[in-house]
Amino acid sequence: MIGHSKPGEGESSDAMAARIDHVLGMMGKPEKFFWCGKLGAGLAAKISNNYISCTFVLVIAEAMAMGIRNGIDPKLLHEVIHNSSGQSFMADHVNPVPGVVPHAPSSNNWRLGFKTQMMVKDIGLGVEAAKRVGIAPTMAEAAIEVWKKAAEDPRCIDRDGSSIWLYLNDIKDE
């Protein structure tokens, strides 16, 4: 997410855009570059995306717990969500239930992907950004309180954020 116009577009300096493109090209794939326009727009896009990601992990953990406690097999519930309107990258790759998605951190002892403590930081940035532009971030304000508690829980500290599953379900750490 780049706070600059794409080379050849907008009012930006083509020389600057070309330079940015060249430098970033050494670090990643151009098809993964999102030229967001003016300075700061790339950061706004990143904060918006992280706002969604942080709330999704919490919502997925709560929804999976609800379904499992109602007797639904965790893998079946994941398949239902994957093939329905609840499908998301986070549900498919960061599902917080151990054993549901083999490559997910939860299936690998919550081996670090993105720390629980960082979830608090990122959702906090989202709350601040929303308020700055006149949006009432009601969902994120509720979510950040849960994330703060999980970030202080020894079962979640310095583990992937999907370890919030342990906190929400009060599961003893093995």
Question: Where do the PLM segments sit?
Answer:
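Hydrophobic alpha-helical segments
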Residues: 170-174
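Helical "substrate-binding/catalytic lid" subdomain
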Residues: 41-167
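Rossmann-fold dinucleotide-binding core
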Residues: 1-54
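Hydrophobic aliphatic residues
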Residues: 24-28, 81, 168
